[in-house]
Amino acid sequence: MSKVYDWFEERLEIQAIADDITSKYVPPHVNIFYCLGGITLTCFLVQIATGFAMTFYYRPTVTEAFSSVQYIMTEVNFGWLIRSVHRWSASMMVLVMILHVFRVYLTGGFKKPRELTWVTGVILAVLTVSFGVTGYSLPWDQIGYWAVKIVTGVPEAIPFIGSSLVELLRGSVSVGQSTLTRFYSLHTFVLPLLTAVFMLMHFLMIRKQGISGPL
């Protein structure tokens, strides 16, 4: 085992990386409220794991979506638990994210030189809400269907381009299979990828600039 470690150490300098991580200075004013960002990350990882598990059984079609969710809840081993954890974690992620935004704002964590950290955080907040909007429609029940119809109909009030935006979101003039396919793709691929990229940027900036000081 020692030889294996030495082989990696010689090439990657693992010990130097570990020392940098473990020796980072933590200001004395930091309290439990400064952990809200990390809790949001934990919820996101839970979402990825449970969501990935459900993709094995979920069918993104208007005729089979609802029945596949029912199958997950009633037939798949621990499917009810996986989906429930996914829902609970989603709600907790939104709640903790909101608290995190308030904490950063109230403690002035958005001020110079951390403006870009704040911007990436706001983008992450928008992505988090987008997860909720797209995920809400995937069971394709009455609530999900009408929620999608209302949400995708909002841009229609925009002059000149409103109708085009609605058709772009829905994939057609009305809500249907194209809409579900779009929302499924957004929820399972586009949004997770964007969130992972912006989270990496967010944490690298925090790592570089450190935690903001007290008020």
UniProtKB/Swiss-Prot annotation:
Classification via Gene3D superfamilies: Cytochrome Bc1 Complex, Chain C (1.20.810.10)
Signal peptide (UniProt feature, chain positions): none
The protein's name: Cytochrome b6
Localization of this protein: Plastid, Chloroplast thylakoid membrane
Natural source organism: Adiantum capillus-veneris (Maidenhair fern)
Cellular component aspect of the GO annotation: chloroplast thylakoid membrane
Subunit-level organization: The 4 large subunits of the cytochrome b6-f complex are cytochrome b6, subunit IV (17 kDa polypeptide, PetD), cytochrome f and the Rieske protein, while the 4 small subunits are PetG, PetL, PetM and PetN. The complex functions as a dimer.
Primary location class: plastid
Membrane topology according to the record: Multi-pass membrane protein
Amino acids binding heme c: 35
Misc. comment: Heme 1 (or BH or b566) is high-potential and absorbs at about 566 nm, and heme 2 (or BL or b562) is low-potential and absorbs at about 562 nm.
Keywords: Chloroplast, Electron transport, Heme, Iron, Membrane, Metal-binding, Photosynthesis, Plastid, Thylakoid, Transmembrane, Transmembrane helix, Transport
The family this protein is said to belong to: Belongs to the cytochrome b family. PetB subfamily.
Cofactor note: Binds 2 heme b groups non-covalently with two histidine residues as axial ligands.
